[in-house]
Amino acid sequence: MNISKTLLICAGVLMLTACATKDYSAESLKHYTAKQLLTTGEQALAKHNYKDSIKYLEAIDALYPFDPEAKQSQIDVIYAYYKAEDYASALGAADRYIHLYPSGEHTDYAYYVKGLVNFEKDRTWLQRIHPTHAEELDLSTLQDSFVDFETLIKLFPKSVYAKDAEKRMLHIRDLLASRELQTAKFYFDRKAYIAAANRASYIIKHLEGAPQVLDALKIMFKSYRALGAEKQANDVLRILQMNFPKEHV
């Protein structure tokens, strides 16, 4: 038997084995009722056995999509995927739940987990231990996380997750402002004053209350002065003196 034919047969065997394993797994769970699957899945979840938990919880949706246990399994599996650090699947499960139950009992939780996932999904383990290095973070996922928490608070202001979501929004705001300020300083140091002023302006307009607002105003003032835009510089100076009377540029 030649090598290419042998490899072809092996590949076919592997494909059949993979398919058979998948089919066997589904078949092996058919003798469970929806309630048994939910109980087993939640027990595995409590033991931090996320892989098994996901298998049982997902089986409910596949085998018993219209049973009352399906709705609970859909919220449980969001948490299981999140804890397993399968962030893409966690987001998919959360989005599906939100689509199916836009005003559901646990929809606030789905938004909350989306916010957590978007904050953590592109960070390394080192960034999770030392989250202050804003220059290393992905701004787009931070912004997505901010929007998730913001949506949660708007739609479910009395949610048990609302207070923590608000705290996380403030933290994200400060990280975004820190990143924008670093960029503004980068442009200013290279005499790209228009770009520096624009970055600083973004902080003031969109990240109100961040500790970086003071430095952003200073960069705007100095940038406008360097550009010879005296009117804009004086406008910024008035705002600076009004809000930070003890500061000097």
Task: Outline where the language-model segments fall.
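Acidic, polar-rich low-complexity tracts and alpha-helical solenoid repeat scaffolds
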Residues: 18-249
